[in-house]
Amino acid sequence: MSLLIRGATVVTHEESYPADVLCVDGLIRAIGPNLEPPTDCEILDGSGQYLMPGGIDPHTHMQLPFMGTVASEDFFSGTAAGLAGGTTSIIDFVIPNPQQSLLEAFHTWRGWAQKSASDYGFHVAITWWSEQVAEEMGELVAKHGVNSFKHFMAYKNAIMAADDTLVASFERCLQLGAVPTVHAENGELVYHLQKKLLAQGMTGPEAHPLSRPSQVEGEAASRAIRIAETIGTPLYVVHISSREALDEITYARAKGQPVYGEVLPGHLLLDDSVYRDPDWATAAGYVMSPPFRPREHQEALWRGLQSGNLHTTATDHCCFCAEQKAMGRDDFSRIPNGTAGIEDRMAVLWDAGVNSGRLSMHEFVALTSTNTAKIFNLFPRKGAIRVGADADLVLWDPQGTRTLSAQTHHQRVDFNIFEGRTVRGVPSHTISQGKVLWADGDLRRRGRGGAVCGTAGVSVGVRGAGATRRTAAPDARSALRPLGLLRSPSPASQI
């Protein structure tokens, strides 16, 4: 099975140049001018378009059991929507219940993911601590290719990891060469503020951002960063939404600490006024955590991307329909937290970032694909256009337009946080494993994707929109071999 993309401009995180790209058996076989197609080769005309690495979304929650319900998007529908938006790989989250075996939860999620339309991998959440958890973390790294563990510093009385769990788990991550990640919100403060607001009679969505002010994110980010600094492990902070949290990351990185930050397009574009919409269902549709914030935080986040102190863009794609959101009609703290975004992430970032001059094309590639691949040790197998890399590509039409709407999107949810926004710059074709799965509005994927596992240890040479930062990866990485891969893993980047 072969595919030749002709006449496009190849755009990577470092350079752009005109070239043909030949894909054979799921890999990039050749790059150059005027390539000759092999027999029975599909030819795709890329004239006037950019050929970029397929998007990698490092933060999704498909069919997540959460807050008394289950997210409406399953692994097939969610990854199919991702293909429609140019995303060819996701990293989802295994979230065990407290006291549940990590391995048991991992196999449950892995079973759900078998129907994925594109490639996938997993972070595993640490929701409790014991010697069993420590042992199973080791098995997940050694036998199942897991190389990152998530810690929720929020959601008290549910999945929140207290400081003793953070310390123990970060230490274990260091031993294994895995990357600890955190949802940085002070869960005790959030719980206190929720109860206080409810006692004052504030029950609607407008209370949601008041219960999770930027200070609770800044405090938690600071605490996680200091714990990681003391233990000596890298740290990845998910969905940064506030100036305070960004300041903590910036300060740590200025001292040479390997801390990486993730941002969502919604936090770059939307503000907290959405929670004051007079229509309850509309306001509730925006409820996620951390919440959307006052406009000054958005400008700070753009500066974080431009300075290289924020490194990836994700979606935290976790869909709940209006009927599910209505579970919190009389108590905002019971509104299921989550919004969609996997289909819109890349187009929104291109339109708001590249078209506005805030980001270059190369920075766009880094933020949507390459940096995630580097941090989670999938580079150069993914996030790159080079011979031997996976043929996961997106052919991007810089003049194409799309109006974002729940009426037309492929996400399995009845709400779109970008409703009515028209973007310029969209994927015309999405290619996964060398096959065209999205073509000018036609979703061709009906089969299965495959598991994508990294090697343990944070990669190096991660580039944000600013200068490259070089950080040593844990030595344990070289002793670990991922299993369950579609193809042999490539070594971590050493640029």
From Swiss-Prot:
<feature type="binding site">
    <location>
        <position position="337"/>
    </location>
    <ligand>
        <name>substrate</name>
    </ligand>
</feature>
<dbReference type="GO" id="GO:0005829">
    <property type="term" value="C:cytosol"/>
</dbReference>
<dbReference type="Pfam" id="PF01979">
    <property type="entry name" value="Amidohydro_1"/>
</dbReference>
<comment type="function">
    <text>Catalyzes the hydrolysis of dihydropyrimidines and of the structurally related DL-5-mono-substituted hydantoins, to produce N-carbamoyl-D-amino acids.</text>
</comment>
<comment type="similarity">
    <text>Belongs to the metallo-dependent hydrolases superfamily. Hydantoinase/dihydropyrimidinase family.</text>
</comment>
<feature type="binding site" description="via carbamate group">
    <location>
        <position position="150"/>
    </location>
    <ligand>
        <name>Zn(2+) 1</name>
    </ligand>
</feature>
<feature type="binding site">
    <location>
        <position position="61"/>
    </location>
    <ligand>
        <name>Zn(2+) 1</name>
    </ligand>
</feature>
<keyword id="KW-0378">Hydrolase</keyword>
<dbReference type="InterPro" id="IPR011778">
    <property type="entry name" value="Hydantoinase/dihydroPyrase"/>
</dbReference>
<feature type="binding site">
    <location>
        <position position="59"/>
    </location>
    <ligand>
        <name>Zn(2+) 1</name>
    </ligand>
</feature>
<dbReference type="InterPro" id="IPR032466">
    <property type="entry name" value="Metal_Hydrolase"/>
</dbReference>
<feature type="binding site">
    <location>
        <position position="239"/>
    </location>
    <ligand>
        <name>Zn(2+) 2</name>
    </ligand>
</feature>
<dbReference type="GO" id="GO:0004157">
    <property type="term" value="F:dihydropyrimidinase activity"/>
</dbReference>
<dbReference type="GO" id="GO:0046872">
    <property type="term" value="F:metal ion binding"/>
</dbReference>
<keyword id="KW-0862">Zinc</keyword>
<feature type="binding site" description="via carbamate group">
    <location>
        <position position="150"/>
    </location>
    <ligand>
        <name>Zn(2+) 2</name>
    </ligand>
</feature>
<comment type="subunit">
    <text>Homotetramer.</text>
</comment>
<feature type="modified residue" description="N6-carboxylysine">
    <location>
        <position position="150"/>
    </location>
</feature>
<feature type="binding site">
    <location>
        <position position="155"/>
    </location>
    <ligand>
        <name>substrate</name>
    </ligand>
</feature>
<feature type="binding site">
    <location>
        <position position="289"/>
    </location>
    <ligand>
        <name>substrate</name>
    </ligand>
</feature>
<feature type="binding site">
    <location>
        <position position="316"/>
    </location>
    <ligand>
        <name>Zn(2+) 1</name>
    </ligand>
</feature>
<keyword id="KW-0479">Metal-binding</keyword>
<dbReference type="InterPro" id="IPR011059">
    <property type="entry name" value="Metal-dep_hydrolase_composite"/>
</dbReference>
<dbReference type="InterPro" id="IPR006680">
    <property type="entry name" value="Amidohydro-rel"/>
</dbReference>
<feature type="binding site">
    <location>
        <position position="183"/>
    </location>
    <ligand>
        <name>Zn(2+) 2</name>
    </ligand>
</feature>
<dbReference type="InterPro" id="IPR050378">
    <property type="entry name" value="Metallo-dep_Hydrolases_sf"/>
</dbReference>
<protein>
    <recommendedName>
        <fullName>D-hydantoinase/dihydropyrimidinase</fullName>
        <ecNumber>3.5.2.2</ecNumber>
    </recommendedName>
</protein>
